[in-house]
Amino acid sequence: MSSLSDQLAQVASNNATVALDRKRRQKLHSASLIYNSKTAATQDYDFIFENASKALEELSQIEPKFAIFSRTLFSESSISLDRNVQTKEEIKDLDNAINAYLLLASSKWYLAPTLHATEWLVRRFQIHVKNTEMLLLSTLNYYQTPVFKRILSIIKLPPLFNCLSNFVRSEKPPTALTMIKLFNDMDFLKLYTSYLDQCIKHNATYTNQLLFTTCCFINVVAFNSNNDEKLNQLVPILLEISAKLLASKSKDCQIAAHTILVVFATALPLKKTIILAAMETILSNLDAKEAKHSALLTICKLFQTLKGQGNVDQLPSKIFKLFDSKFDTVSILTFLDKEDKPVCDKFITSYTRSIARYDRSKLNIILSLLKKIRLERYEVRLIITDLIYLSEILEDKSQLVELFEYFISINEDLVLKCLKSLGLTGELFEIRLTTSLFTNADVNTDIVKQLSDPVETTKKDTASFQTFLDKHSELINTTNVSMLTETGERYKKVLSLFTEAIGKGYKASSFLTSFFTTLESRITFLLRVTISPAAPTALKLISLNNIAKYINSIEKEVNIFTLVPCLICALRDASIKVRTGVKKILSLIAKRPSTKHYFLSDKLYGENVTIPMLNPKDSEAWLSGFLNEYVTENYDISRILTPKRNEKVFLMFWANQALLIPSPYAKTVLLDNLNKSPTYASSYSSLFEEFISHYLENRSSWEKSCIANKTNFEHFERSLVNLVSPKEKQSFMIDFVLSALNSDYEQLANIAAERLISIFASLNNAQKLKIVQNIVDSSSNVESSYDTVGVLQSLPLDSDIFVSILNQNSISNEMDQTDFSKRRRRRSSTSKNAFLKEEVSQLAELHLRKLTIILEALDKVRNVGSEKLLFTLLSLLSDLETLDQDGGLPVLYAQETLISCTLNTITYLKEHGCTELTNVRADILVSAIRNSASPQVQNKLLLVIGSLATLSSEVILHSVMPIFTFMGAHSIRQDDEFTTKVVERTILTVVPALIKNSKGNEKEEMEFLLLSFTTALQHVPRHRRVKLFSTLIKTLDPVKALGSFLFLIAQQYSSALVNFKIGEARILIEFIKALLVDLHVNEELSGLNDLLDIIKLLTSSKSSSEKKKSLESRVLFSNGVLNFSESEFLTFMNNTFEFINKITEETDQDYYDVRRNLRLKVYSVLLDETSDKKLIRNIREEFGTLLEGVLFFINSVELTFSCITSQENEEASDSETSLSDHTTEIKEILFKVLGNVLQILPVDEFVNAVLPLLSTSTNEDIRYHLTLVIGSKFELEGSEAIPIVNNVMKVLLDRMPLESKSVVISQVILNTMTALVSKYGKKLEGSILTQALTLATEKVSSDMTEVKISSLALITNCVQVLGVKSIAFYPKIVPPSIKLFDASLADSSNPLKEQLQVAILLLFAGLIKRIPSFLMSNILDVLHVIYFSREVDSSIRLSVISLIIENIDLKEVLKVLFRIWSTEIATSNDTVAVSLFLSTLESTVENIDKKSATSQSPIFFKLLLSLFEFRSISSFDNNTISRIEASVHEISNSYVLKMNDKVFRPLFVILVRWAFDGEGVTNAGITETERLLAFFKFFNKLQENLRGIITSYFTYLLEPVDMLLKRFISKDMENVNLRRLVINSLTSSLKFDRDEYWKSTSRFELISVSLVNQLSNIENSIGKYLVKAIGALASNNSGVDEHNQILNKLIVEHMKASCSSNEKLWAIRAMKLIYSKIGESWLVLLPQLVPVIAELLEDDDEEIEREVRTGLVKVVENVLGEPFDRYLD
């Protein structure tokens, strides 16, 4: 029986759609999939039904199955159908119909009609309430769509779907993680699988649903991958659903099941029984082609998960047959051929073993399977074992031969171990399979003996052999024909029978005598067995034993040397026992007499085939010698096969034997031995002419013969091809090689190619050319059997061959020309028209292909070359251009390859001593460069020209113009590494050749090159400029080229500035600085001097027409610079000097980059002890020249440019102004340049160079700038420069009187000395410092402010250094400085006022730091300066104040602060001064110690009262004063904290008397209200900080505050702010009372009356503060009943009807606050309050009534815990 809760839930569910009231019905009706609730609520069923019917009709057109619902769910009668009044059976039928509809509609939710049709079911049948599970299940796979979100918004989620609850009202759809959580619930999983089962039964599955289901199942498995318990729970569910999916006819269902099974088995390895059952289920219903691949993949992966023993056993018979019926051999092999096939060795092993057990007809596919899969060792072992067992029962064992050959090829040891484990040996197994298998040649002699001579022969055995003989009687041979000539197939059958007979235990002699009736046939058969690779080793040994027997039966007169060649071939056998047996037979033959009657001499190798034999004596001698030298351990017998004596005879003999012997194996052996003979020559190869010539025709028969005899056909052909010997003279042999290359046989072609490569170098040139041409011709055939290009590139070709082959494949024949005139090739339209013909076009393409292949080969060889080859290549370049321009063929690759070959050839010629070339076609190169559209080709051609430059300077002279014009226009604009390297290399090679051949015009050529390159500078990629131009400058010689280059760049810099391209100008400066990095400092200085010389030339041309004409012909000035107007020229000169300034100045970046810093580069040379003295002298000379040049321009700037303007007579008068401006600017820039130049030298050199100029120079500007530079020169110098600094200081001190008339020089001298004193300080001589201080104190009184400022700065630094030693100058420093400050305050027009005040402040700061005790007397003056230096930034003044606080006695500071406030600050109306004063005071208070604070407390409180009175005398606005007072309160609170009660209490009393009585008031203008306001603000702040510590201090205030409160009541005192402050002070005191101070009856009675009576006229704005105060008083006294009664009575007095509304309102609020805080203490007083409350509830003022009802009454009820109405009743 279900629980009560379950029963209630069921009742609720049944009644979910029953609506008993209107709201409930409206809510049910408004639930909609389409409309919002408001719209849905207004719709009737007829409207909804009409829309749904139309939608259903549309769905029926898509899926006819929907039509059935038009008679049920969508019938007219359904409009009036109410499911709440239906019977159970009717409801069940309705639910079934709805479920069927939802199943069918599940795949159509992406269609709008589905939504509209389902809307009817929601609105009429409430499926979102009654059929929730089916609705959710059928739409769950749409969980990320808006449709599902809409369903969630109207549905009531069943318990199993609670995971979706977070998304019911969310804008976001459910996530994939939500689905995992949902499916991870076992109950839900069972529900969903049940639903899926219904879908499968009704064929309602679809791809999207299956994809969703599969993904969810997979995610659940992955989610629980580490939870074996949960995975085991999933086993029955997933297997069940997989089985149902597999039972479906749908291929999608089956593929889904496959996926689920694979993933699940991977996560949790299943038992083999389950996997076999799954495999059977997978196969049972498998028909669709697409599903078959998935099924096979699944089966393989399932088997791969198996672990432990028996995982690769044979499949059960039933499953194997089922699998066999579904998958044919081709499909399995196709599956295994795919690159993405899975690891499937376990299944393939099981399947292979199953074939061996159940279906032997398919043994032939096992090998194909094994070759396509990699098996584990144990798997291979099991298959081998199965096949060995199978060999025992299989009649036709030939099926197993290939399998075991494969196994032996991959692991012979494993096969032998398997045989051994089954009690077999390799020899016996070979006999069983009737073929040779193993390479291991060591056989067991006992086995051979056992096989050769069975122990005893019974009648039964005889009968059995007779039966065997009768069965194979067709193979009996009764003729004396040699078995060596027998066909391969017949021999193979006889060999198999022989092996089988031996294996069955029959005697070998019985078999031989029965199947071969003649001695000849027996012996030749046994010989063939001996040399047959197909024969087992044991059988060969048996054969050798029988040969020995049969030889003895041959007559003595017969010479059996004819058998020797075959036996010699048998010596190649791997088995030493076989070779030993052969040697024994050879010994028997050697013992026989040598007669002329040779055994089978005309039949052994075929009927009527006469074998040329040796002379009997020679044969006897040869055999004897061979046996003496032969050792059985030796495989290689080539050395002893042809003895030196009669070598030619023996070579001829063996050559004939190799030609005539029919066995391919024997032929291979003999040919190998012949080819190894060092004396074998091509003369012997003539024997093979007929055989070789017809070999290709007979190749297929030889191939079959090799296969039948198990002879390696590749080895056979290699031996044959190796007959082509080095220095081959026979043309038929060369033809054979070429025929082999051109044949369709890939193996033969490759062997021929290898042989050709090895002997090519030994052939004559005609043969080489023939071969190369053949290969080139073959290369045009895309179906060649060998790698034509690879072979051609592997041949050792020389330059003559290349020249010949290139000429043979050339379309122009200009090599015979001797007159290489420098002309351009001309083309006619006829050549273009010719190329339009298809035949000609095809020939051209073929020609291009051949040419490309030849060039590739040449490019790979590299180490060949000759002048003839070079000219040929250049000629071909012209051919390619023709093919490109006229034929339109793709010659780009061929051109690049040809150029590469040309470069290699030139390099080769240089390396091999070639120094000069003549008649080089330069026009071809230039034409190719200009006409090519490929930057790569152009670049490589430039490299060719560069390489030719040293070999043919004539080419350069005739081509330099087009070459460099082209480079400037194209190459240097390319942004790639290769092009850059090309241009650099061209420069490095071409420029020297150009200069070498310039013949006196070197400068002109150099300037032409520089102009060409700099013109294209803007087009060169920025990151490649430095490398390119650095290469150019270095190649041209920086000493000669740098000045001209800088001038050209200066022009571009000026142009950029004129056109406002500031970015470009900056880039040019960076470029030049980076360029100068790679140059030596001497070269850099020389370049700058050359630049100044060029500028001098240019300026002189403006004053002399003759000089101008002489410069017009110079390339450097050919760009219009000589034709500038006056203004343009002045601008250019200004910008040029600015350019020089920029490249010589030292920036922050240069400071950190040693390579860019000119000064450091000079230092590194001058200070390096290893530097060459000549170099140092050159640098000094160059520097002197540079300094001289700059000074020349400075001294002559006005004269120079006035001469220029005098030539311009037509200029307007404003040009004079322009000239003046330009001259001033140029002069300023020149002085900057001078400073840069002077900084270049080390300090000692610099000082020696500059100091004399200060005395000798008459130009004031020069002296000014020189002095200015001195100051900056020492910035980076260390203490080692002290002697130099002393010297400089002395000179400057001496110069000062002389420069007194010049303000700027005086100022700069003082500033320089200031900088030096600041840097070197105490290290300077004391006398110099004293002189400097004396000078400075004198100059303080100067009339010029600039000098005053500089003097003050020098004094400051000197005082810093001298300290107390400067005390003698104190009267000359401090008083004058104060006077200066006061004078500056009065002087409002001085533009340097700020700087002067800063200088004074800094001076005082220095004095404070160094001599603070001496400054005490003037500390007031110092503060005066600080507070009133209005021009100085506040941060500076605050810093000086900090110094005062740190260094001056704070007691004295506090006294001075009181004085200065009273005398100056208070009356100044300067907010900044007041602010700085307060900052000083604050810092003083913070830093003063408690003892000092206590001793100075009277002064501080005097100052405090003065600050309180500031309000009455200040003209500041109220907000400003309030901020000042707030700061004062903070400071005073900090001060109070440093005092004890004993000291502070009397001072507090003084404050109280000052506030209430006016005692001690210094300013009569301050009112009582202002005093009280100041006091209470201070007191309230004090209470916040000290809290209960000063509660008792209220004693001094009690009566005055009581009187003040009464004055507020009587309105004698009216100030809302003051009233608020007083009330707040009481509140704070009450709040912080910890000592029951306010519980004293006397204090309580005194203050309670006056405080409560404030209710009578309290202002609304501060009423809340009064309420808080009364509440605090009540709370403080809550434990004293008498006080509670008094307070209650006092408050009630103000709640009576006679009181004003405002009074009653605040009284009510006070009472409410009291009851909310301490209501329980006041409950006893409630009876007194009830009548008052009752009266107030009937008050005419609604606000009062509301406040009582909603406020006071509610609070009282909370305290009482019961309604207040009872008390009222």
Swiss-Prot record:
Q: What GO MF annotations does this protein's record show?
A: snoRNA binding; U3 snoRNA binding
Q: Which sections of the protein are HEAT repeats?
A: 1729-1767
Key words, A-Z: Acetylation, Mitochondrion, Nucleus, Ribonucleoprotein, Ribosome biogenesis, rRNA processing, Transcription
Entry's localization field: Nucleus, Nucleolus; Mitochondrion
Residues where N-acetylserine occurs?
2
One Pfam family, short name: HEAT_HEATR1
Q: Which domain of life is it from?
A: Eukaryota
Query: Which coarse location class applies to the principal site listed for this UniProt protein?
Result: nucleus
Q: What else is known?
A: Present with 18200 molecules/cell in log phase SD medium.
Quaternary state and interactors: Interacts with snoRNA U3. Interacts with MPP10. Component of the ribosomal small subunit (SSU) processome composed of at least 40 protein subunits and snoRNA U3. In the absence of snoRNA3, forms a complex with other t-UTPs. This complex can associate with pre-18S ribosomal RNAs.
Protein known as: U3 small nucleolar RNA-associated protein 10
User: What organism is recorded for this protein?
Assistant: Saccharomyces cerevisiae (strain ATCC 204508 / S288c)
**Annotated gene:** UTP10
